[in-house]
Protein backbone atom coordinates (compact mmCIF):
# COMPACT_ATOMS: atom_id res chain seq x y z
CA UNK A 1 0.00 0.00 0.00
CA UNK A 2 1.39 3.42 -0.96
CA UNK A 3 1.70 6.29 1.48
CA UNK A 4 -1.06 8.09 -0.40
CA UNK A 5 -3.42 5.14 0.02
CA UNK A 6 -2.68 4.71 3.71
CA UNK A 7 -3.33 8.39 4.41
CA UNK A 8 -6.48 8.34 2.29
CA UNK A 9 -7.91 5.48 4.32
CA UNK A 10 -7.97 7.50 7.55
CA UNK A 11 -11.31 9.26 8.15
CA UNK A 12 -11.04 12.96 8.94
CA UNK A 13 -13.53 13.75 11.71
CA UNK A 14 -13.01 17.50 11.38
CA UNK A 15 -13.92 17.48 7.71
CA UNK A 16 -16.81 15.07 8.18
CA UNK A 17 -18.89 17.94 9.63
CA UNK A 18 -18.48 20.07 6.48
CA UNK A 19 -21.54 20.56 4.29
CA UNK A 20 -21.28 19.58 0.65
CA UNK A 21 -19.68 22.45 -1.23
CA UNK A 22 -20.25 23.61 -4.77
CA UNK A 23 -16.78 24.85 -5.69
CA UNK A 24 -15.62 27.13 -8.49
CA UNK A 25 -11.88 27.38 -9.18
CA UNK A 26 -10.16 30.01 -11.30
CA UNK A 27 -6.47 29.43 -12.06
CA UNK A 28 -3.78 31.86 -13.16
CA UNK A 29 -0.27 31.06 -14.35
CA UNK A 30 1.74 27.95 -15.12
CA UNK A 31 1.13 24.22 -15.61
CA UNK A 32 2.02 23.63 -11.96
CA UNK A 33 -0.89 25.85 -10.98
CA UNK A 34 -3.15 23.90 -13.34
CA UNK A 35 -2.02 20.69 -11.64
CA UNK A 36 -2.52 22.17 -8.17
CA UNK A 37 -6.03 23.32 -9.09
CA UNK A 38 -7.03 19.82 -10.20
CA UNK A 39 -5.59 18.25 -7.04
CA UNK A 40 -7.32 20.90 -4.95
CA UNK A 41 -10.64 19.82 -6.44
CA UNK A 42 -9.72 16.15 -5.92
CA UNK A 43 -9.11 16.67 -2.20
CA UNK A 44 -12.29 18.70 -1.74
CA UNK A 45 -14.35 16.05 -3.54
CA UNK A 46 -12.71 13.25 -1.54
CA UNK A 47 -12.75 14.82 1.93
CA UNK A 48 -15.50 17.45 1.86
CA UNK A 49 -18.03 15.96 -0.55
CA UNK A 50 -17.61 18.91 -2.90
CA UNK A 51 -18.60 19.07 -6.52
CA UNK A 52 -17.14 21.40 -9.12
CA UNK A 53 -19.30 23.95 -10.92
CA UNK A 54 -18.54 25.89 -14.09
CA UNK A 55 -19.80 29.35 -13.14
CA UNK A 56 -18.95 31.43 -10.05
CA UNK A 57 -22.58 32.39 -9.47
CA UNK A 58 -23.39 28.70 -8.88
CA UNK A 59 -20.76 28.23 -6.15
CA UNK A 60 -20.76 28.12 -2.35
CA UNK A 61 -16.95 28.27 -2.40
CA UNK A 62 -14.93 30.47 -4.77
CA UNK A 63 -11.21 29.68 -5.04
CA UNK A 64 -8.62 31.79 -6.85
CA UNK A 65 -5.35 29.95 -7.56
CA UNK A 66 -2.83 32.73 -8.17
CA UNK A 67 0.49 33.36 -9.91
CA UNK A 68 3.08 35.96 -8.88
CA UNK A 69 5.64 35.59 -11.67
CA UNK A 70 4.66 38.56 -13.84
CA UNK A 71 4.07 42.26 -13.30
CA UNK A 72 1.06 43.49 -11.36
CA UNK A 73 0.16 39.96 -10.24
CA UNK A 74 -1.12 41.18 -6.89
CA UNK A 75 -3.32 43.84 -8.46
CA UNK A 76 -4.89 41.27 -10.79
CA UNK A 77 -5.70 39.15 -7.76
CA UNK A 78 -7.37 41.96 -5.82
CA UNK A 79 -9.26 43.07 -8.92
CA UNK A 80 -10.71 39.57 -9.29
CA UNK A 81 -11.53 39.39 -5.59
CA UNK A 82 -13.35 42.70 -5.92
CA UNK A 83 -15.48 41.24 -8.70
CA UNK A 84 -16.26 38.19 -6.57
CA UNK A 85 -17.25 40.25 -3.54
CA UNK A 86 -20.76 40.77 -4.92
CA UNK A 87 -21.46 37.04 -4.69
CA UNK A 88 -20.77 37.21 -0.96
CA UNK A 89 -22.89 40.36 -0.64
CA UNK A 90 -25.78 38.58 -2.36
CA UNK A 91 -25.30 35.42 -0.27
CA UNK A 92 -23.29 35.74 2.98
CA UNK A 93 -22.80 31.95 3.18
CA UNK A 94 -20.50 32.07 0.14
CA UNK A 95 -16.83 31.67 1.08
CA UNK A 96 -13.85 33.02 -0.87
CA UNK A 97 -10.37 31.48 -0.80
CA UNK A 98 -7.04 32.57 -2.26
CA UNK A 99 -4.29 30.05 -3.00
CA UNK A 100 -1.12 29.82 -5.04
CA UNK A 101 1.97 31.98 -5.12
CA UNK A 102 0.43 35.39 -4.40
CA UNK A 103 -1.21 33.84 -1.32
CA UNK A 104 2.17 32.45 -0.26
CA UNK A 105 3.84 35.81 -0.81
CA UNK A 106 1.19 38.04 0.78
CA UNK A 107 -0.23 35.78 3.52
CA UNK A 108 -2.42 37.63 6.02
CA UNK A 109 -1.90 40.88 4.12
CA UNK A 110 -4.60 39.62 1.75
CA UNK A 111 -7.11 39.83 4.62
CA UNK A 112 -6.12 43.42 5.35
CA UNK A 113 -6.72 44.49 1.74
CA UNK A 114 -9.72 42.19 1.19
CA UNK A 115 -11.29 41.51 4.61
CA UNK A 116 -14.14 39.56 3.00
CA UNK A 117 -11.72 36.72 2.09
CA UNK A 118 -12.19 33.61 4.24
CA UNK A 119 -9.28 31.30 3.35
CA UNK A 120 -5.65 31.92 2.38
CA UNK A 121 -3.48 28.90 1.58
CA UNK A 122 -0.17 28.30 -0.18
CA UNK A 123 0.91 25.81 -2.84
CA UNK A 124 2.32 23.51 -0.15
CA UNK A 125 -0.76 23.62 2.08
CA UNK A 126 -3.62 23.11 -0.38
CA UNK A 127 -4.22 19.65 1.13
CA UNK A 128 -5.22 21.36 4.40
CA UNK A 129 -8.05 23.29 2.76
CA UNK A 130 -10.83 20.87 3.85
CA UNK A 131 -9.88 21.39 7.51
CA UNK A 132 -9.59 25.17 7.04
CA UNK A 133 -12.98 25.16 5.35
CA UNK A 134 -14.59 23.13 8.14
CA UNK A 135 -13.26 25.51 10.80
CA UNK A 136 -14.48 28.56 8.90
CA UNK A 137 -17.91 27.01 8.35
CA UNK A 138 -18.05 26.30 12.10
CA UNK A 139 -17.66 29.98 12.92
CA UNK A 140 -13.90 30.39 13.28
CA UNK A 141 -12.20 33.51 11.98
CA UNK A 142 -10.63 33.69 8.52
CA UNK A 143 -8.04 30.95 8.03
CA UNK A 144 -4.45 31.58 6.85
CA UNK A 145 -1.94 28.76 6.25
CA UNK A 146 0.97 29.47 3.92
CA UNK A 147 3.67 27.31 5.53
CA UNK A 148 6.26 25.29 3.59
CA UNK A 149 5.74 21.82 5.15
CA UNK A 150 8.11 20.13 2.70
CA UNK A 151 6.54 17.27 0.72
CA UNK A 152 3.68 16.70 3.15
CA UNK A 153 0.87 17.64 0.79
CA UNK A 154 1.41 14.64 -1.49
CA UNK A 155 0.88 12.30 1.48
CA UNK A 156 -2.65 13.66 1.90
CA UNK A 157 -3.88 13.95 -1.67
CA UNK A 158 -6.14 11.25 -3.13
CA UNK A 159 -5.17 9.53 -6.35
CA UNK A 160 -5.96 11.88 -9.24
CA UNK A 161 -8.97 11.62 -11.52
CA UNK A 162 -8.07 11.52 -15.21
CA UNK A 163 -9.91 13.96 -17.45
CA UNK A 164 -8.76 12.87 -20.89
CA UNK A 165 -5.77 11.08 -22.41
CA UNK A 166 -3.16 13.55 -21.12
CA UNK A 167 -2.29 14.47 -17.54
CA UNK A 168 0.14 16.49 -15.47
CA UNK A 169 2.09 14.82 -12.67
CA UNK A 170 4.03 16.93 -10.19
CA UNK A 171 7.34 15.20 -9.37
CA UNK A 172 8.94 17.96 -7.29
CA UNK A 173 8.19 21.31 -5.73
CA UNK A 174 10.13 24.53 -5.40
CA UNK A 175 13.39 25.83 -6.80
CA UNK A 176 16.82 26.33 -5.23
CA UNK A 177 18.47 28.25 -8.08
CA UNK A 178 17.53 31.73 -6.79
CA UNK A 179 17.87 33.55 -10.10
CA UNK A 180 17.98 37.23 -9.23
CA UNK A 181 14.72 38.10 -11.02
CA UNK A 182 12.57 35.15 -9.94
CA UNK A 183 10.09 34.99 -7.09
CA UNK A 184 9.47 31.21 -7.22
CA UNK A 185 11.93 30.16 -4.45
CA UNK A 186 10.23 32.63 -2.13
CA UNK A 187 6.68 31.49 -2.91
CA UNK A 188 7.16 27.73 -3.37
CA UNK A 189 10.25 27.08 -1.27
CA UNK A 190 13.42 25.13 -2.03
CA UNK A 191 13.50 22.00 -4.18
CA UNK A 192 11.87 18.90 -2.70
CA UNK A 193 11.46 15.75 -4.80
CA UNK A 194 8.70 13.18 -4.42
CA UNK A 195 9.86 9.58 -3.90
CA UNK A 196 10.02 7.56 -7.10
CA UNK A 197 7.45 5.04 -5.86
CA UNK A 198 4.91 7.81 -5.19
CA UNK A 199 5.32 9.28 -8.67
CA UNK A 200 5.03 5.88 -10.33
CA UNK A 201 1.92 5.03 -8.30
CA UNK A 202 0.25 8.22 -9.51
CA UNK A 203 1.20 7.54 -13.13
CA UNK A 204 -0.08 3.95 -12.90
CA UNK A 205 -3.38 5.21 -11.53
CA UNK A 206 -3.69 7.63 -14.43
CA UNK A 207 -2.75 4.96 -16.98
CA UNK A 208 -5.45 2.66 -15.58
CA UNK A 209 -7.93 5.50 -16.25
CA UNK A 210 -6.89 5.76 -19.90
CA UNK A 211 -4.14 8.39 -19.80
CA UNK A 212 -1.64 7.90 -22.64
CA UNK A 213 0.62 10.92 -22.12
CA UNK A 214 2.03 12.38 -18.89
CA UNK A 215 3.83 15.67 -18.39
CA UNK A 216 6.22 15.54 -15.41
CA UNK A 217 6.19 18.89 -13.64
CA UNK A 218 8.57 20.87 -11.48
CA UNK A 219 9.76 24.47 -11.25
CA UNK A 220 13.24 23.08 -11.97
CA UNK A 221 12.25 19.57 -12.94
CA UNK A 222 15.64 18.38 -14.16
CA UNK A 223 16.97 18.84 -10.61
CA UNK A 224 14.72 15.93 -9.61
CA UNK A 225 16.37 13.63 -7.05
CA UNK A 226 13.64 11.31 -5.81
CA UNK A 227 14.30 8.64 -3.20
CA UNK A 228 14.35 5.00 -4.28
CA UNK A 229 13.29 2.15 -2.00
CA UNK A 230 16.95 1.36 -1.24
CA UNK A 231 17.64 4.92 -0.10
CA UNK A 232 19.51 5.93 -3.25
CA UNK A 233 18.37 8.83 -5.41
CA UNK A 234 17.05 8.75 -8.98
CA UNK A 235 17.58 11.61 -11.41
CA UNK A 236 14.99 12.71 -13.96
CA UNK A 237 16.45 10.48 -16.66
CA UNK A 238 15.97 7.37 -14.53
CA UNK A 239 12.47 8.48 -13.56
CA UNK A 240 11.54 8.90 -17.23
CA UNK A 241 12.84 5.40 -17.99
CA UNK A 242 10.69 3.99 -15.16
CA UNK A 243 7.58 5.89 -16.28
CA UNK A 244 8.09 4.62 -19.84
CA UNK A 245 7.82 1.03 -18.59
CA UNK A 246 4.30 1.58 -17.21
CA UNK A 247 1.75 -0.15 -19.49
CA UNK A 248 -0.42 2.33 -21.35
CA UNK A 249 1.97 5.29 -21.15
CA UNK A 250 3.07 6.02 -24.70
CA UNK A 251 4.36 9.58 -24.49
CA UNK A 252 6.23 11.51 -21.79
CA UNK A 253 6.97 15.22 -21.49
CA UNK A 254 8.57 17.29 -18.74
CA UNK A 255 8.71 20.97 -17.84
CA UNK A 256 10.34 23.31 -16.84
CA UNK A 257 14.12 22.88 -16.98
CA UNK A 258 17.22 24.86 -16.06
CA UNK A 259 20.30 24.63 -18.32
CA UNK A 260 22.74 24.45 -15.40
CA UNK A 261 21.30 21.12 -14.21
CA UNK A 262 20.64 19.36 -17.49
CA UNK A 263 22.71 16.27 -16.70
CA UNK A 264 23.97 13.47 -18.95
CA UNK A 265 21.30 11.04 -17.73
CA UNK A 266 18.58 13.24 -19.21
CA UNK A 267 20.44 13.48 -22.51
CA UNK A 268 20.68 9.68 -22.47
CA UNK A 269 16.89 9.52 -22.03
CA UNK A 270 16.46 11.46 -25.27
CA UNK A 271 18.69 8.85 -26.91
CA UNK A 272 17.24 5.72 -25.33
CA UNK A 273 13.57 6.34 -24.46
CA UNK A 274 11.34 6.57 -27.54
CA UNK A 275 8.35 7.48 -25.36
CA UNK A 276 10.08 10.77 -24.45
CA UNK A 277 8.55 13.40 -26.73
CA UNK A 278 10.52 15.25 -29.41
CA UNK A 279 10.15 18.48 -27.48
CA UNK A 280 12.15 20.50 -24.97
CA UNK A 281 11.29 23.74 -23.21
CA UNK A 282 14.62 25.06 -21.91
CA UNK A 283 14.58 28.70 -20.76
CA UNK A 284 17.67 30.72 -21.67
CA UNK A 285 16.34 34.19 -20.68
CA UNK A 286 19.07 36.17 -22.51
CA UNK A 287 21.76 35.77 -25.14
CA UNK A 288 24.18 38.05 -23.30
CA UNK A 289 26.73 36.66 -20.85
CA UNK A 290 26.67 39.96 -18.96
CA UNK A 291 22.92 39.79 -18.45
CA UNK A 292 23.02 36.08 -17.59
CA UNK A 293 25.54 36.90 -14.86
CA UNK A 294 23.33 39.68 -13.48
CA UNK A 295 20.42 37.25 -13.56
CA UNK A 296 22.52 34.71 -11.57
CA UNK A 297 21.68 31.98 -14.06
CA UNK A 298 24.82 29.96 -13.35
CA UNK A 299 25.87 29.40 -16.98
CA UNK A 300 27.01 31.34 -20.02
CA UNK A 301 25.57 31.31 -23.51
CA UNK A 302 28.29 29.02 -24.89
CA UNK A 303 27.33 26.34 -22.34
CA UNK A 304 23.66 26.65 -23.34
CA UNK A 305 24.42 26.28 -27.04
CA UNK A 306 26.76 23.33 -26.43
CA UNK A 307 24.02 21.62 -24.42
CA UNK A 308 21.50 22.09 -27.24
CA UNK A 309 24.00 20.62 -29.71
CA UNK A 310 24.42 17.55 -27.48
CA UNK A 311 20.68 16.95 -27.23
CA UNK A 312 20.07 17.47 -30.94
CA UNK A 313 22.87 15.02 -31.72
CA UNK A 314 20.94 12.20 -30.03
CA UNK A 315 17.44 13.45 -30.97
CA UNK A 316 17.67 15.14 -34.39
CA UNK A 317 13.94 15.87 -34.62
CA UNK A 318 13.84 17.84 -31.36
CA UNK A 319 11.53 20.87 -31.26
CA UNK A 320 12.98 23.55 -28.97
CA UNK A 321 11.14 26.26 -27.02
CA UNK A 322 12.47 28.76 -24.49
CA UNK A 323 11.80 31.79 -22.27
CA UNK A 324 13.34 35.22 -22.93
CA UNK A 325 13.38 38.48 -20.98
CA UNK A 326 14.24 41.86 -22.50
CA UNK A 327 14.95 45.11 -20.69
CA UNK A 328 16.70 43.60 -17.68
CA UNK A 329 18.51 46.26 -15.58
CA UNK A 330 21.86 47.02 -17.22
CA UNK A 331 20.83 45.83 -20.68
CA UNK A 332 21.78 48.00 -23.64
CA UNK A 333 21.22 47.73 -27.38
CA UNK A 334 24.45 45.72 -27.59
CA UNK A 335 23.24 43.07 -25.13
CA UNK A 336 19.89 42.89 -26.88
CA UNK A 337 21.62 42.33 -30.22
CA UNK A 338 23.48 39.44 -28.59
CA UNK A 339 20.11 37.90 -27.74
CA UNK A 340 18.91 38.26 -31.34
CA UNK A 341 22.14 36.67 -32.60
CA UNK A 342 21.72 33.77 -30.17
CA UNK A 343 18.13 33.23 -31.35
CA UNK A 344 19.40 33.05 -34.94
CA UNK A 345 22.15 30.57 -34.05
CA UNK A 346 20.06 28.25 -31.89
CA UNK A 347 16.68 28.36 -33.62
CA UNK A 348 13.58 28.08 -31.43
CA UNK A 349 11.18 26.29 -33.73
CA UNK A 350 8.87 25.56 -30.80
CA UNK A 351 8.46 29.24 -29.99
CA UNK A 352 9.16 31.17 -26.81
CA UNK A 353 7.54 32.92 -23.91
CA UNK A 354 9.04 36.41 -24.20
CA UNK A 355 8.45 39.31 -21.84
CA UNK A 356 9.61 42.75 -20.82
CA UNK A 357 11.37 42.51 -17.46
CA UNK A 358 9.22 43.44 -14.48
CA UNK A 359 10.71 43.63 -10.97
CA UNK A 360 9.25 41.18 -8.48
CA UNK A 361 9.10 42.34 -4.86
CA UNK A 362 11.66 40.71 -2.61
CA UNK A 363 14.02 39.56 -5.36
CA UNK A 364 17.63 40.80 -5.66
CA UNK A 365 17.02 42.19 -9.16
CA UNK A 366 14.33 44.47 -7.78
CA UNK A 367 17.12 46.37 -6.02
CA UNK A 368 19.05 46.99 -9.25
CA UNK A 369 18.86 50.37 -10.95
CA UNK A 370 16.54 50.01 -13.91
CA UNK A 371 17.76 52.63 -16.36
CA UNK A 372 16.40 51.01 -19.51
CA UNK A 373 13.84 53.33 -21.17
CA UNK A 374 10.38 51.79 -21.44
CA UNK A 375 10.24 52.65 -25.14
CA UNK A 376 13.42 50.63 -25.73
CA UNK A 377 12.03 47.65 -23.83
CA UNK A 378 8.86 47.60 -25.91
CA UNK A 379 10.72 48.03 -29.18
CA UNK A 380 13.13 45.21 -28.29
CA UNK A 381 10.26 42.90 -27.41
CA UNK A 382 8.55 43.57 -30.75
CA UNK A 383 11.76 42.87 -32.67
CA UNK A 384 12.44 39.70 -30.69
CA UNK A 385 8.92 38.37 -31.11
CA UNK A 386 9.03 39.07 -34.85
CA UNK A 387 12.23 37.01 -35.14
CA UNK A 388 10.75 34.16 -33.10
CA UNK A 389 7.56 34.27 -35.17
CA UNK A 390 9.61 33.87 -38.36
CA UNK A 391 11.35 30.79 -36.96
CA UNK A 392 8.16 29.16 -35.72
CA UNK A 393 6.30 29.87 -38.97
CA UNK A 394 9.11 28.44 -41.09
CA UNK A 395 9.20 25.30 -38.96
CA UNK A 396 5.43 24.88 -39.34
CA UNK A 397 5.61 25.26 -43.13
CA UNK A 398 8.35 22.63 -43.27
CA UNK A 399 5.81 20.08 -42.00
CA UNK A 400 3.47 20.48 -44.98
CA UNK A 401 2.95 17.11 -46.65
CA UNK A 402 4.52 15.16 -43.80
CA UNK A 403 2.72 12.56 -41.72
CA UNK A 404 2.71 13.11 -37.98
CA UNK A 405 1.76 10.88 -35.05
CA UNK A 406 -0.92 12.79 -33.14
CA UNK A 407 -2.49 11.90 -29.80
CA UNK A 408 -6.13 12.96 -30.15
CA UNK A 409 -7.02 14.70 -26.90
CA UNK A 410 -10.43 16.23 -27.58
CA UNK A 411 -12.52 18.64 -29.64
CA UNK A 412 -10.72 21.42 -31.50
CA UNK A 413 -10.76 24.85 -29.85
CA UNK A 414 -10.99 26.41 -33.30
CA UNK A 415 -14.05 24.37 -34.27
CA UNK A 416 -15.68 22.07 -31.68
CA UNK A 417 -17.11 19.98 -34.52
CA UNK A 418 -13.56 18.83 -35.29
CA UNK A 419 -10.84 17.06 -33.32
CA UNK A 420 -7.47 18.23 -32.08
CA UNK A 421 -4.27 16.69 -30.80
CA UNK A 422 -0.55 17.25 -30.47
CA UNK A 423 2.44 15.86 -32.27
CA UNK A 424 5.44 14.54 -30.40
CA UNK A 425 6.99 17.96 -31.06
CA UNK A 426 4.08 19.61 -29.21
CA UNK A 427 2.45 21.12 -32.30
CA UNK A 428 -1.34 21.41 -32.24
CA UNK A 429 -3.09 19.73 -35.20
CA UNK A 430 -6.79 20.22 -36.03
CA UNK A 431 -8.71 17.85 -38.31
CA UNK A 432 -12.16 16.36 -38.99
CA UNK A 433 -12.82 13.04 -37.27
CA UNK A 434 -15.00 10.89 -35.08
CA UNK A 435 -15.24 11.74 -31.34
CA UNK A 436 -14.79 8.03 -30.60
CA UNK A 437 -11.16 8.48 -31.64
CA UNK A 438 -10.35 10.68 -28.62
CA UNK A 439 -7.59 9.01 -26.60
CA UNK A 440 -6.08 7.24 -29.61
CA UNK A 441 -3.05 7.97 -31.73
CA UNK A 442 -3.63 8.89 -35.37
CA UNK A 443 -1.36 9.34 -38.35
CA UNK A 444 -2.23 12.74 -39.79
CA UNK A 445 -1.01 14.24 -43.05
CA UNK A 446 -0.36 17.97 -42.66
CA UNK A 447 -2.25 20.01 -45.25
CA UNK A 448 -2.06 23.55 -43.86
CA UNK A 449 0.42 25.30 -41.59
CA UNK A 450 -0.14 28.29 -39.35
CA UNK A 451 2.33 29.65 -36.82
CA UNK A 452 0.63 28.18 -33.77
CA UNK A 453 -1.37 25.30 -35.22
CA UNK A 454 -1.50 22.86 -38.12
CA UNK A 455 -4.34 21.34 -40.08
CA UNK A 456 -4.43 17.89 -41.58
CA UNK A 457 -6.33 14.85 -42.72
CA UNK A 458 -6.36 11.55 -40.90
CA UNK A 459 -4.59 8.72 -42.71
CA UNK A 460 -4.99 6.07 -40.01
CA UNK A 461 -6.23 5.73 -36.45
CA UNK A 462 -4.94 3.31 -33.86
CA UNK A 463 -7.20 0.24 -33.81
CA UNK A 464 -9.44 1.60 -36.55
CA UNK A 465 -9.86 0.28 -40.09
CA UNK A 466 -9.62 3.23 -42.49
CA UNK A 467 -10.97 3.06 -46.04
CA UNK A 468 -9.90 6.56 -47.07
CA UNK A 469 -8.14 9.57 -45.63
CA UNK A 470 -10.48 11.72 -43.57
CA UNK A 471 -10.45 15.49 -43.86
CA UNK A 472 -9.49 18.19 -46.27
CA UNK A 473 -6.82 20.79 -46.56
CA UNK A 474 -7.31 24.51 -46.22
Curated annotation (Swiss-Prot):
Residues 21-138 form the MTTase N-terminal domain. Pfam families: Radical_SAM, TRAM, UPF0004. One of its GO terms (cellular component) is cytosol. It is found in: Cytoplasm. Residues 161-395 form the Radical SAM core domain. The keyword 4Fe-4S applies. It catalyses: N(6)-dimethylallyladenosine(37) in tRNA + (sulfur carrier)-SH + AH2 + 2 S-adenosyl-L-methionine = 2-methylsulfanyl-N(6)-dimethylallyladenosine(37) in tRNA + (sulfur carrier)-H + 5'-deoxyadenosine + L-methionine + A + S-adenosyl-L-homocysteine + 2 H(+). GO terms for molecular function: 4 iron, 4 sulfur cluster binding; metal ion binding; N6-isopentenyladenosine methylthiotransferase activity. Belongs to the methylthiotransferase family. MiaB subfamily. Catalyzes the methylthiolation of N6-(dimethylallyl)adenosine (i(6)A), leading to the formation of 2-methylthio-N6-(dimethylallyl)adenosine (ms(2)i(6)A) at position 37 in tRNAs that read codons beginning with uridine. NCBIfam families: miaB-methiolase, MiaB/RimO family radical SAM methylthiotransferase. This is tRNA-2-methylthio-N(6)-dimethylallyladenosine synthase. It comes from Halorhodospira halophila (strain DSM 244 / SL1) (Ectothiorhodospira halophila (strain DSM 244 / SL1)). The lineage of its organism: Bacteria, Pseudomonadati, Pseudomonadota, Gammaproteobacteria, Chromatiales. The gene is miaB.
Amino acid sequence: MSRNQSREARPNREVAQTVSERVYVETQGCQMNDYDAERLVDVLVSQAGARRVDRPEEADLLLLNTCSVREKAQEKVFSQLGRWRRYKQDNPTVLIGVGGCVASQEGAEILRRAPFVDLVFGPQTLHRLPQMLARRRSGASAQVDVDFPEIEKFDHLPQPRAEGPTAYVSVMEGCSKYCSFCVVPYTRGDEISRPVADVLAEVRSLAEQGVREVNLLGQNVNAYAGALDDGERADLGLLIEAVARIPGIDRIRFTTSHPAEFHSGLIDAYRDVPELADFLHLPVQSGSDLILKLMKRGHDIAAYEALIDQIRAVRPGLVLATDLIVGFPGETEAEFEETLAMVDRVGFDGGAFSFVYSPRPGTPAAELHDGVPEADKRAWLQRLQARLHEQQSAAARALLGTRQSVLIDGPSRRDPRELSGRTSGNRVVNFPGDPSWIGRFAEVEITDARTHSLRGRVVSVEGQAMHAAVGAGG
